[in-house]
C-alpha cells in the first residue's frame, strides 16, 4: 500500500509539471532523488514529446528506483502511456498505460482531472485496470489477473485549511485476490464510500460493500491515525446468504478453531455499534440456518435466533432449532432462552431433548472477562434408552437405560474442570469419572485428563452387546491418569477384574477363544481335554486384564503372573480352565485391531 501511495505522488508530480509546459516541444526529465512521507525515489527519468493533438496523442515513459516508507530495499519501477493526451485544460488521459515494478504490474487506462471551481480545489481519477498482479514481501497480500475500475474524488476549500472531502468507487470485475486471511477466487464485488480526512482522522460518512452471492454491508465510522484504530464504528448488513458467507468470510476467521470445516445454509443479519472506542451493542438474527460439521461432530438444522446485546441494557436471548446431532446422538426440537446483562449471560435452566430423554442444564452463568469466556453450569442426563443410543452411534444393540449426573463444570482461561464426580448408570452398574480436566476443549487440539471407576457392571449384558461370547458375572475397572490428545488416548493405567462378592461366574467357550486372542500369539486356554466335548461353558474364580499405555505400547498383565506370562482367566471347579497370556508388550493399534476382530466374531484361538 505504501508503494502505491508513493507511486501516485510521483505521477501527480510529473503530470503537474507537464501540465504547465505547453510552450515546450519535448521534455526529458531527470531527477536524482525525491523524498516524501510515502517513501523515496532516485534515478528518475521521464520522456515526453509535446505538441500532440487529439488525433495524434504521444507516449510518455517514466523509469525510477523507488523505496516505499518501511521498505529496506530499492526496486525498479517502469511506467508508460501509449497515448497521453490533454483534451482540455487540467484534464489528462492515459490510454494503453503500463506499470511494472517488483510488487505490482498492470495495464490500465487513466483519466485525471485537477481544477478549481467556486473556491474548491478538486482532484479526480478514474482508472480501469486490466490483468493487474500484485503482492507484498510478507506474502500477506496478492492478486492475479485482476480487472476492475477505481474512481477517486478529492476536494477542499482553496483559501483556508480544511479537511479533504473524498469519495471512492471500486468495481472489481474479475481476477483472484488473497488478503490475509481472506481469499477471493473471482470478482463481481463492489465498494462505494465517502467521507472526510485530515491530519488526525479519516471519517467514513457512508460505505457500502457488496459481496457477490453473499449480500451487502453498510458502514460508517471514524478512524484515528495515531491510534491506528476505529474510535466510532457502525456496521449493518442486509440479509446475508450463509452458504456463501461461510467459505468466503467466516471460515478464514475460524481456521484455528473447531468450527473450521462447516457447511451452512439459511440467512442472517448483523448490526454492530462501537462508540468512543467501546463496544456498545450488536444484534444477530438467524433465519432457518443449517450448520453441519463436515467432520461429523455436530449439526443443527433450521436454527432461528434473536441474539441482542448492549452495554447499557439487559436483553433476552432466544434460540430454537428443529433437530440436529451431537457426536451422532440425535437432538430433538428445542427452544432455549437466556438473559444477557453487559458482559454476562445467565439461564436458570435449559432443557435439551436427546433421544427419548433430555439433558437438563442448570445454574448457567457465563462472563466475558479480559477477552476470554468464563462459565459454569450443572447438568443431569435424564434416563434414555440404550437401544436408541446404540443405534444412533452404530454400535451393537444395548439393552437397558442410561442416566448421568454431572456436577458443577467450570471453564476458565481455556481449561474445563469439574467440581465433583460425573456419575453414569449403565449395564446395571455405575461408572464414575473423577479429576476431569480439559484444555482447549473447543480448539483444534483438545487435551483431556481424568480417572475412571467402573463398579458392578453386568458382564452378561456387556459381552452379549459386543458379540464377545457370554461371561456371567460382574465387572469392576479402574482407569488411572487417562490422557487424551485430540480425543485419542496417549497414556493410561487400566485394570478390569471381576467384582468382589458371591455370584455365579461362568464363561462360554466363545468368550474363552476371544480372551485368548486378546492375549496375543501364544496365548492359550488350558482345559481338561477328556471333558472338553461335553461343555459349552465353564466356571471361573478370577478374571482380569491390565494395560499400561505409554508411547503407543500397551504393557499387559492379568490377575496374576507366571514365569512365562500372566493369567487372564483362572479356572474353578470342573472342568477347570485357565487362560494365559504371554505377550506383555503389545502395540496400541494392534490391540485395537484384536478387539475389533473378536467383537466382530472373526477370530478363533487354540483351545486345549
Specify the residue positions occupied by each region the protein language model found.
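C-terminal structural cap/anchor segments
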Residues: 480-484, 490-498
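Outer-membrane beta-barrel and related beta-rich outer-membrane complex signature
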Residues: 504-513
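Extended amphipathic, helix-rich lipid-handling scaffolds
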Residues: 21-216, 222-294, 303-413, 417-419, ...
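Bacterial N-terminal signal peptides
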Residues: 9-18
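C-terminal structured domain segments
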Residues: 536-578
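Short edge-strand/loop segments of extracellular domains
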Residues: 426-429, 497-503
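N-terminal secretory signal peptides that target proteins for export/translocation
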Residues: 1-4
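Histidine- and/or cysteine-centered catalytic micro-motif in compact active-site loops
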Residues: 453-457, 495-501
